Amino acid sequence: MAAAAGPGAALSPRPCDSDPATPGAQSPKDDNEDNSNDGTQPSKRRRMGSGDSSRSCETSSQDLGFSYYPAENLIEYKWPPDETGEYYMLQEQVSEYLGVTSFKRKYPDLERRDLSHKEKLYLRELNVITETQCTLGLTALRSDEVIDLMIKEYPAKHAEYSVILQEKERQRITDHYKEYSQMQQQNTQKVEASKVPEYIKKAAKKAAEFNSNLNRERMEERRAYFDLQTHVIQVPQGKYKVLPTERTKVSSYPVALIPGQFQEYYKRYSPDELRYLPLNTALYEPPLDPELPALDSDGDSDDGEDGRGDEKRKNKGTSDSSSGNVSEGESPPDSQEDSFQGRQKSKDKAATPRKDGPKRSVLSKSVPGYKPKVIPNAICGICLKGKESNKKGKAESLIHCSQCENSGHPSCLDMTMELVSMIKTYPWQCMECKTCIICGQPHHEEEMMFCDMCDRGYHTFCVGLGAIPSGRWICDCCQRAPPTPRKVGRRGKNSKEG
C-alpha cells in the first residue's frame, strides 16, 4: 500500500503520480495526464537546477505527506571548515523537519544561497547528503536565523532539537574522554629516573615564564579595571615609603580636644615667620598680597592702577610699621628698611617686564652700529646679475639677507632709498626667512604684514589687529623714531620760514 511505503516512496520513478494522503483517489488532472500518457508518448520531466530548490522542497514534502522527520537528521555544518567559516543548515532538511510545504515562499526574508560543488562533496563525505542529492540544487540557510525562527514560531520543534544537541555534546565529551584515557593507557611507559630532575627544571622554567608574562600583562594592560557593582574604576595605589614604627608611634597626648587642653604637638615657626608675629614688636610688616596676572589688552590704565595700588600698599605698610614701632618707643632697624626697599624694588622689576616685555623685544631688534653682511660675488635672485648692473643696466649695490645667502637689487625688490637706508641698520631678512619681530615665528604667513618704513615683519594678532590694514602701515618701532624730512625742497622751505 502507498501508506506503508514510507520514505522509500520518495525514491520511486513516478513520485508525483499519486498522493500518499489519499491513496485510493486521483484528481481529474491526474486522469487527464494518464489518458494523455497512455503508452503512445512518454511524459517529459524537466530536470531541476539550482534555482528549483524550493520546488524540490515542495515536491519532497508533498511526497512524504508531512511524515515525521527526526531531529537527529537535521544537521548543522560549518563552511568553509576553517576558522573563517560560518554555520549553515540545508533548507530541504529544515522544511521537512518543520513540516512546511513551500518554505521559500513562506519565509522569503531569510538569507539563503546555493551550495557549491565543493560544499556538496564536503557534505557527502560527512554522510549528510546522498549521491543523488549531490546532483540536485540544494540551498543553505544560516543556522542562527533558523534557530531564531524555530524559537519564535516552532517552540516545540526547537525544544526537541535542543535535546538532540545536548545529547550530541554529551556524547562528544564522552568520546573525547575515552580517547584521552586510551592514549594514557598506551603511553604508560616509565620515565627514566635520571631525566626526572631535567623535567622538573623544565616545568619550573615554564611556570616561571608564565608567571612573569602574567604579571607583566597585569602591570601593563590590566592595571585598572571597572567595578560593575560600584561603577568605579579601580586603580592600583601608588608605592610609598613606610617609616619605621618608632617614628609613627602616637603619643599619649596627640591633640587637644577642648581649648586649653595640653597636647604634645606644636607648630614650629621659622625665624623669618617669627619676625612677622607680634611677640614684642613685629620686625617685618605684613606680607604683600600676591599679584594677579594682568591681561596685555588692558592698556595703560592697568599700569596706572597697578602703580596707584603699589603706592597705597607701600604707604599703608610704612604707616603700619611706623605706628607699631612708635607705640613701643623703638626706632626701625636698618635691616628692616633695607629689606623693605629690596622687596619693593624686586616687585617693581617683576611688574615692569610684564607690560613692557614685547616693546623691549621690538626695540632690541635694531642694533646700534650694525654693519650689514658683505658678499663679494653676490648675484641678484631676480635678475641674476651682480652689482655691476641691475635689470635697467645700471650699477647698483646689493642688499643681503642676514639669515641666508639670498641677495637682491633694491630696484628689483621695489624698495626706495629710504627703505634701503633703514634696512642697513638692523639684521634684515628676505621674504623666505621673514619672521615676526614680536614672537619670532615664521608661521601664519597669511597673517604677516610688513612695515612700510623698515620692512620688519609682524603678525596681525601679535600687534592686536584683526586683519591686515589697507594702505600704509608703520610699526611702533618706526613711530618712536624721530621724524626725518624726506624731500630736500620741503626741508629748504622750512629752513627759510624758520
Curated annotation (Swiss-Prot):
Segments of this protein annotated with the region Essential to induce neural progenitor proliferation: 89-185, 292-334
Compositional bias of kind Basic and acidic residues: 345-359
Gene3D superfamilies from the UniProt entry: Zinc/RING finger domain, C3HC4 (zinc finger)
UniProt keyword Lipid biosynthesis, yes or no: no
Region annotation SAY: where it falls in the sequence: 89-295
Pfam families: PHD
Residues where N-acetylalanine is found: 2
High-level lineage: Eukaryota, Metazoa, Chordata, Craniata, Vertebrata
GO molecular function: chromatin binding; histone acetyltransferase activity; transcription coregulator activity; zinc ion binding
Organism: Homo sapiens
GO biological process, one term: positive regulation of myoblast differentiation
UniProt subcellular location: Nucleus
Name by which UniProt lists this protein: PHD finger protein 10
Bias (Polar residues) ranges: 318-328
